[in-house]
Amino acid sequence: MSSGQSGVCPCQGSAGRPTILYALLSPSPRTRPVAPASHSHCLCQQQRPVRLCAPHRTCREALDVLAKTVAFLRNLPSFCHLPHEDQRRLLECCWGPLFLLGLAQDAVTFEVAEAPVPSILKKILLEEASSGTQGAQPSDRPQPSLAAVQWLQRCLESFWSLELGPKEYAYLKGTILFNPDVPGLRASCHIAHLQQEAHWALCEVLEPWYPASQGRLARILLMASTLKNIPGTLLVDLFFRPIMGDVDITELLEDMLLLR
């Protein structure tokens, strides 16, 4: 049997299925989102690094969303009156889902293209240069994968299909922000009460459409839970690192909220 079949990816077997060795060496599906087959023809393509097609425009829109997120928190007395340490812990845990809700609310769209992969020689030269310079930062940090970005885009599309209003977005942000399960909180009981209040407010907004609102509420909460599975590193690498470089978003938000 010939191994040089045209149009067959090296990660595929003769029947078009992933080879056993490739499957063993690939990352666990628990840590990597899997896109439907319609988006890609093979596992190799799903793992390819990608970058924004219009980084300056998209990063500017992402920064606008981040600023609106800060404004939302500043105008929320129930958050501002919490102990500063609790504010920091909630921010560290919840900034990603809040930012994603902001992207969905502002209908931010973006396209990605395959990122060039540096040659082995270039990697060796970069490693030698960085090892010879004290305090040098690694410049070959992996780009986001196509699978991860497509997963993120599908989450945003799902929220757009819900057509949430401003009040629904606001109360949903409250249910995500006030998470009493964040470790180390001093006022966890009070935060649990705030989360319940936000949940009740969301239910009241949907009440005029009862009983259909029950199914809508379930869909909203289900979609919100998926946002927590999108890693913050993906958001930083995709939306902020192309323009701002390596940045700690949590520290940036703390500075903007005057928590440090």
From Swiss-Prot:
It is found in: Cytoplasm; Nucleus. Keywords: Biological rhythms, Cytoplasm, Methylation, Nucleus, Receptor, Repressor, Transcription, Transcription regulation. Residues 16-260 form the NR LBD domain. One of its GO terms (molecular function) is nuclear thyroid hormone receptor binding. One of its GO terms (cellular component) is protein-containing complex. Belongs to the nuclear hormone receptor family. NR0 subfamily. Heterodimer; efficient DNA binding requires dimerization with another bHLH protein. Interacts (via N-terminus) with NEUROD1 (via N-terminus and C-terminus). Interacts with ID2. Interacts with NR5A2, PPARA and PPARG. Interacts with RARA, RXRA, THRB, NR5A1 and NR1I3. Interacts with EID1. Interacts with NR1D1. Interacts with RORG. Interacts with NFIL3 and BHLHE41. Interacts with HNF4A; the resulting heterodimer is transcriptionally inactive. This is Nuclear receptor subfamily 0 group B member 2. It comes from Mus musculus. The lineage of its organism: Eukaryota, Metazoa, Chordata, Craniata, Vertebrata.
